[in-house]
Curated annotation (Swiss-Prot):
Protein name: Phenylalanine--tRNA ligase alpha subunit
Cofactor(s) it depends on: Mg(2+)
GO annotation (BP), single: phenylalanyl-tRNA aminoacylation
Enzyme class, UniProt record, top EC level: ligase
Record NCBIfam families: pheS
Xref: InterPro entries: aa-tRNA-synth_II (IPR006195), aa-tRNA-synth_II/BPL/LPL (IPR045864), Phe-tRNA-synth_IIc_asu (IPR004529), Phe-tRNA_ligase_II_N (IPR004188), Phe_tRNA_ligase_alpha1_bac (IPR022911), Phenylalanyl-tRNA_Synthase (IPR002319), tRNA-bd_arm (IPR010978)
Domain of life: Bacteria
Gene source species: Myxococcus xanthus (strain DK1622)
Enzyme Commission number(s) from the entry: 6.1.1.20
Taxonomic lineage of the native organism: Bacteria, Pseudomonadati, Myxococcota, Myxococcia, Myxococcales
Length: 349
C-alpha cells in the first residue's frame, strides 16, 4: 500500500506540473483528492492493517496529501497568471467603439406622481419650496393655528424627537418632531418673503399610523397663494385646472365644506371616480366621487404668525397626499405595496 501511495504521488506530480489551464487543474484535484478520488481509494483499506503499520502509512498519506494540495495551489496560480497574460496579449480596447448603455430601472410610482404634480403646478406659475423634515412644534402646530390645547392635534399622531437625538439643535423652549404635514413650509416661506406668493411644497411627512391605507412615512404636496384680493373662486379655478391637467379633461371636481385649523373657510375636494367615470362602483362606494385633497382660504391667525397683516392680504392653501393620488391614477389597492420593494410590482411602472 505504501508503494501505491508513492506511485500515486509521482503520477500526480507529473500531471499537475504539466497542467496549464484552470479547468485541467480542477479536474486533477477532483481525480486525486476528491471524495471518490484515487487517494481516498488507496486509503480505503487502511482499516484492515495492524495499528503500527496503519499509523506509519497514515503519516505517509498525510504527507502526500499536503504535497499535492501545495502543488495544486501553485498550478492554479500559474494557470491564472497565464490566462491574464493571454488576455493582455490579446486585442486591445478599441476606444472608437460606442459605449455600452447602462440598464436603468423605472421611476417609482410615488416619485413619478409627485414630479408630475409639481410640474403641473409649475405650469400654472407656482414656484417650488422645501423645508426641514425635523421641525419645531411651533411651525408644525402653533404657527398654523394649532395651540398646545387644540383638540385637532389629536388628528395627527406625532413622532417626537428627544433631546439626546437632536443634540445642540434643540431649543430650550421648543420641542422637536418629525413634521406631520408640509404646511410648516408655508409659514417659513412667508416669513422670508413679501406678497405676492405662489408656491408648492412637496416632501416627506411622518405620522404614527400603519394600515392598508396609511404608512408611518408618506409624501404630501402643499400649495400656497397669497396676494391682495384673492378669492375662493380663484382657489376653485386653480384646483379645477390641476385636476383636468392631471386626471383628464373629462374629470369634474366637487367642493365639500370641511374643517382645517389653518384655513377658513375650508373644503374637501372630490373628483369623479377614475374607475367608473362617476357612474358608481365599489372603488367610490357607488357615489361616483373620490376625495383627493383638502383646501381653503388661509386663516388670519396663520398670516399673523408669518408677519402678514390679514386685513391687507388674503390667500388660499391646499394639500394632497401623493400616495393617494398615485393609488387613484394607477389603480393600486394597497398603499403598502409602494414601500415593499417588490420588483414584480415596481417594474410595471
Amino acid at each position: 500500500m505504501r508503494d501505491r501511495l508513492l506511485a500515486l504521488a509521482e503520477s500526480a506530480r507529473r500531471e499537475i506540473g504539466g497542467a496549464s489551464e484552470l479547468s485541467a487543474v480542477e479536474a486533477l484535484r477532483v481525480r486525486y483528492l476528491g471524495k471518490k478520488g484515487e487517494l481516498s481509494g488507496v486509503l480505503g483499506g487502511m482499516g484492515k492493517l495492524p495499528p503500527d503499520e496503519r499509523r506509519s502509512l497514515g503519516e505517509v498519506a498525510n504527507s502526500v496529501k499536503a504535497e499535492l494540495e501545495k502543488l495544486l495551489a501553485e498550478a492554479v496560480e500559474r494557470a491564472e497568471a497565464a490566462a491574464l497574460e493571454a488576455q493582455l496579449q490579446g486585442p486591445g480596447l478599441d476606444v472608437t467603439l460606442p459605449g455600452r448603455g447602462v440598464a436603468l430601472g423605472s421611476r417609482h410610482p410615488v416619485s413619478r406622481t409627485m414630479e408630475e404634480i409639481v410640474r403641473t403646478f409649475s405650469r400654472l406659475g407656482f414656484d417650488v419650496a422645501s423645508g426641514p423634515e425635523i421641525e419645531l412644534d411651533y411651525f408644525n402646530f402653533e404657527a398654523l393655528n394649532l395651540p398646545k390645547d387644540h383638540p385637532a392635534r389629536d388628528m395627527q399622531d406625532t413622532f417626537y424627537v428627544d433631546e439626546a437625538t437632536l443634540g445642540h439643535a434643540k431649543k430650550a423652549d421648543s420641542s422637536a418632531l418629525l413634521r406631520t404635514h408640509t404646511s410648516p413650509v408655508q409659514v417659513r416661506y412667508m416669513l422670508n418673503r413679501k406678497p405676492p406668493i405662489r408656491a408648492v411644497m412637496p416632501g416627506r411627512v411622518y405620522r404614527r399610523d400603519s394600515d392598508i391605507t396609511h404608512t408611518p412615512m408618506f409624501h404630501q404636496v402643499e400649495g400656497l397663494l397669497v396676494d391682495k384680493g384673492v378669492t375662493f373662486a380663484e382657489l376653485k379655478g386653480s384646483l379645477a385646472a390641476f385636476v383636468t391637467a392631471f386626471f383628464g379633461s373629462d374629470t369634474r371636481t366637487r367642493f365639500r365644506p370641511s374643517f382645517f385649523p389653518f384655513t377658513e373657510p375650508s373644503a374637501e375636494v372630490d373628483i369623479t371616480c377614475t374607475n367608473c367615470a362617476g357612474k358608481g362602483c365599489r372603488i367610490c362606494k357607488q357615489t361616483g366621487w373620490l376625495e383627493v385633497l383638502g383646501s381653503g382660504m388661509v386663516h388670519p391667525n396663520v398670516f399673523t404668525s408669518a408677519g402678514y397683516d390679514p386685513n391687507e392680504v388674503t390667500g388660499y392653501a391646499f394639500g394632497m397626499g401623493v400616495e393617494r393620488i398615485a393609488m387613484l391614477r394607477y389603480r393600486i389597492d394597497d398603499l403598502r405595496m409602494m414601500f415593499e420593494n417588490d420588483a414584480r410590482f415596481l417594474e410595471q411602472f
